[in-house]
Amino acid sequence: MGLSPSNISKLFEPFGFEQAKAVIAAVSGGSDSLGLLFLVRDYMAMLQNPPRLIAVTVDHQLRAESKAEAENVGLLCRQYGIEHRILVWDEAKPTSGLAAAARTARYRLLVQAARDVGGAFIVTGHTQDDQIETFLMRKERSAHAEARGLAAMSLRSLLDGLGLEGSVELDRPLLSVSRQTLRDELRGRGINWVDDPSNANTEYERPRIRHGIAAEADRQTVLDQIAEAGAARERDNAALIAALGNPASLRADANGALLVDPQLYAALPGNARRLFSGLLAAIAGGRRFLPGDSERSRIERVLSGDDDTHRLTVFGALIERGDSGSPHRFLREKRNLPKLHLEPGKPIVWDGRFRFLNEGMMDFELAAPGRQELADFLKSQNIEIESRKREALLVSPALYREGRLFALLFLQDGEFQQDIHIERHFAIFDHVLPGHDFDLARAVEARIGRICAEMS
């Protein structure tokens, strides 16, 4: 007995697919993704004006069989009248961190597929089993009892956007459904699936957890723990969001530093305080993730005054404790700043902190100036600035043309080239934004803002 139409409707109805032009279903050929494909197909058949359903298989080219497996998914889709595409990760493969690189490439290709067809949704076949495994993996890695990642996967995430704008939505409708239920569903339909041999290789973390502690764990106990972790994350977010409702809580100054009110910071509950400082370190440092537990503890000791040090560098950020009524300051550390080519018409992100679009005709280079180079440029322009402004310029993007320093961001008297648009980029929100944190991202963005300059 398969899932009833009412059960299928309950799984997919909350996502609002009927408003979409197209929905991309990520289908590898395994039981989870095929179960997803046929359930979402059934749901689309219930809609009066269903969107276009496109199954997309990513061939990572990591196994000799992967091409044939992707083609077999295509044959199955044709048999059932489902549109199908194969996308290939044909880049050089890294010698380490292969699983993470493959995941990043897979989502990049899926996002591009969605954008190509005007789609706003990608759906994946993550199951309740994946949720349990993810929780146990993160719990095993983390020494901090309140680790935010223990809230596990969210039903919704946003990919490759500007916070809540311009993103493609990644949806996981099957997080309440077991893998066994999906396999029973496929057997009832006479549909076979392929088991990826890497899923049985316990040298990898997830298979090791799957065939170890996840197999022995009581499912309901783990699900209750996931719910508790999710509630804790919501409490921390809510406390910080409430504090950010005060306009004095957080602002960006003219030099690009993030300024925090010390009294408001000290009044936050402990976990919300650690979250706040970790978020600002990630934003100032251009990072996609929060600092680790030990790094956030170091920040907390310095900002609380429990450490004699007034400043520290961590996670690419320089952090200074405020004194005598001055705010805490978070800004970029002067290390590992990139040099990028800014082509006409091609948006790029510089250092995880700024998004550029060159709407003109000329090419530029983007890089942070050296100390002597900056001094020479300011002297040539007869510009005098105070030391903090100078330090900020040394970690800010500058425009170069034919090897010459041409213009400086955050220097209003600089000679700016026309048609260069800049806005603030939050790597921690704009790469992947879990549904748990939608409201938090809104609150932070409301205090800091996006637009830096419209150079013309």
UniProtKB/Swiss-Prot annotation:
The keyword Repeat does not apply. Its EC number is 6.3.4.19. The keyword Ion transport does not apply. InterPro entries: Rossmann-like_a/b/a_fold (IPR014729), TilS/TtcA_N (IPR011063), tRNA_Ile_lys_synt (IPR012094), tRNA_Ile_lys_synt_N (IPR012795). It is found in: Cytoplasm. It comes from the Bacteria. Gene3D superfamilies: HUPs. Ligates lysine onto the cytidine present at position 34 of the AUA codon-specific tRNA(Ile) that contains the anticodon CAU, in an ATP-dependent manner. Cytidine is converted to lysidine, thus changing the amino acid specificity of the tRNA from methionine to isoleucine. This is tRNA(Ile)-lysidine synthase. It comes from Brucella anthropi (strain ATCC 49188 / DSM 6882 / CCUG 24695 / JCM 21032 / LMG 3331 / NBRC 15819 / NCTC 12168 / Alc 37). The gene is tilS.
